[in-house]
């Protein structure tokens, strides 16, 4: 699919958000710090701008996390293990799926001396379901399908369960 034009929407041209979104066929939500990106999306009213958007939205890393209606902002920076840190924040509302990317990279991380998964994320999964994905795996969603492509896990109510291996595709609508 060749394209002849692209634009970056960031803090330098945020005032053009409505125009840029309206002219786009494809929107790529890049990675970064989830709450920082989320605050920018709220500032430019991206949830509202995407309500009637007819193109494709592709999320990468933090961008995929912020696509959810309610985003789980998994702690990653010093101080974010604190009970005052807001871990569940309003997202773009494009999906109900919560993705935790880069599993192979972050599974052994600690934040403020706490093990990221065992002592923070597992307890936060009580009453929630997170899809934990290593790099190379992804979720594909359209009007009819919700597919887990590649190796992936579910983390719900404190229990992590492997759902797929590399190269496999699982229709999550049938689960």
Residues covered by each model-derived region:
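Glycine/Thr-rich phosphate-binding loops of Rossmann-like dinucleotide-binding domains
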Residues: 37-38, 68, 75
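Catalytic nucleophile loop
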Residues: 30, 51-70
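Glycine/threonine-rich flexible loop motifs
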Residues: 34-43, 109
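Catalytic-core regions built around general acid/base machinery
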Residues: 20-23, 43-55
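N-terminal beta1-alpha1 cap of cysteine-dependent amidohydrolase-like domains
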Residues: 1-26, 30, 161-168, 172-175
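General beta-strand structural signal in soluble alpha/beta enzymes
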Residues: 5-6, 28-29, 58-60, 131-133
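C-terminal and late-domain segments of enzyme folds
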Residues: 73-175
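Short, basic, glycine/proline-bearing loop/turn elements
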Residues: 2-3, 29-35, 98-101
């Amino acid at each position: 699919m060749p394209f002849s034009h692209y634009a970056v929407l960031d803090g330098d041209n945020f005032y053009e958000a409505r125009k840029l979104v309206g002219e786009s066929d494809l929107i790529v939500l890049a990675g970064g710090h989830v709450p920082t990106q989320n605050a920018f999306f709220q500032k430019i009213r991206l949830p509202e701008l995407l309500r009637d958007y007819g193109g494709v939205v592709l999320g990468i890393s933090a961008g995929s996390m912020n696509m959810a209606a309610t985003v789980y902002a998994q702690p990653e920076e010093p101080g974010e293990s604190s009970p005052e840190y807001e871990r569940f924040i309003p997202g773009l509302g494009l999906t109900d799926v919560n993705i935790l990317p880069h599993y192979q990279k972050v599974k052994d991380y600690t934040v403020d001396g706490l093990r990221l998964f065992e002592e923070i994320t597992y307890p936060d999964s009580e009453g929630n379901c997170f899809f934990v994905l290593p790099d190379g795996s992804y979720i594909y969603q359209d009007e009819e399908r919700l597919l887990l492509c590649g190796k992936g896990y579910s983390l719900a109510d404190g229990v992590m369960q492997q759902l797929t291996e590399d190269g496999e595709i699982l229709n999550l609508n049938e689960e």
